[in-house]
C-alpha cells in the first residue's frame, strides 16, 4: 500500500525511491508488526480477561499446568492482526505470492478461531470436530497448492530440490500439488502440537521465519540464486516483508507469552503460523530445509504418531505423555528448562538449514 504511495511521490522527490528496497521494507515490516503487538497486547489481554476467554487445562496433564487454567487464550488473533497490517502496508500488493501466503495464513487462522471459539466460548471441550478441521485444512491447502501449480512460470517452481546435492532435482508434475498439500497442512498441525508450553512454539516459529526470509531474498535474486545453485523464483523476494512481519509480530507476542504466560496464542495462531511457514517453504522450493529447521515441530509430531501407534498396536505407551515436551515435564524437568532447551535445538537446526546454502 505504502509502496504505491512512494512510487507516486517519486515524481516530486527522488528520495522516495528508497522504499523500493526490499531490505528497508523488511525492516519497517518487523518494526511495524512489533510495535502493533506491543501496543495492542495489553488491551487484548484485558479484553480476553473481561470476556473470560480462558484456557482449559487437561486434568491428566502435568500438575504444574493446573495454575494455567483461566489464562487468556486466542491471543493468536493479535499476531495475525499485526502480520496482516504490516504486510499490507509495506509489501508489493501486486505480487501473487504475498496474497497466497497472506490468504493461507488468515484462512487457517479462521479454522483455529472457530475451534478456539467452540472450546472457550461455547464450552465445547471437543472444539471443532477433527473431521471438519482437517476437511477445511485440506480445502484451503489444496486450493493454495493448485493455485501455485497453475501459476508456476517455470519448471523449477514445481521441482523438488534436495539440499547438499547440487545436481539432483526431481520434477514433480502434478505431484507438486500433493507435496504442497502435505507440507502446508503438516506444518500447520505440527506447530499446533508444539504450542503446549509458554513460548515454546512462537520463538522457533520466529527463528524459522527469519531463516526463510533469507531464502526468499536469495531465491528472488537471479544473481544470488545462480551463485548458490538454488532455484530462482521471480517475485519470491517480496515475501521478505511477510516473514519480517511474522518475526516482529511473534517477538511482540512473546513479550506476553514468555513464562509465566499472560496469554496463549490458541489454535487461531498456531494453525495459521504453521501453514504460513509451509507455504513460504514451498514457494522458495525449500521443503526439505523446512523439515530440518523445524525439527522441533517434527519431533513433537512424531512423538504423537509414535505414541498413538504404539498404544493401538501393543497397548503400551512409549512416552509418559505426548507431545514429547510433556514427557520431559513428567520426568521432572521444570517448564522453563524444556522451553529453553527446545529453543537451543531450534537455533542449531536453523543454522544447519542456512548452511545448506553453501554445502552443495
From Swiss-Prot:
Cysteine-cysteine disulfides: none
Molecular function per GO: metal ion binding; phospho-N-acetylmuramoyl-pentapeptide-transferase activity; UDP-N-acetylmuramoyl-L-alanyl-D-glutamyl-meso-2,6-diaminopimelyl-D-alanyl-D-alanine:undecaprenyl-phosphate transferase activity
Record-linked CDD domains: GT_MraY
Pathway entry: Cell wall biogenesis; peptidoglycan biosynthesis
EC class (word): transferase
GO BP: any one term: regulation of cell shape
InterPro entries linked: Glycosyl_transferase_4 (IPR000715), PNAcMuramoyl-5peptid_Trfase (IPR003524), PNAcMuramoyl-5peptid_Trfase_CS (IPR018480)
Membrane topology, as annotated: Multi-pass membrane protein
Catalytic activity as recorded in UniProt: UDP-N-acetyl-alpha-D-muramoyl-L-alanyl-gamma-D-glutamyl-meso-2,6-diaminopimeloyl-D-alanyl-D-alanine + di-trans,octa-cis-undecaprenyl phosphate = di-trans,octa-cis-undecaprenyl diphospho-N-acetyl-alpha-D-muramoyl-L-alanyl-D-glutamyl-meso-2,6-diaminopimeloyl-D-alanyl-D-alanine + UMP
Domain of life: Bacteria
EC number: 2.7.8.13
Major localisation: membrane
Named cofactor requirement(s): Mg(2+)
Listed NCBIfam families: mraY
Family: Belongs to the glycosyltransferase 4 family. MraY subfamily.
Name this polypeptide is given: Phospho-N-acetylmuramoyl-pentapeptide-transferase
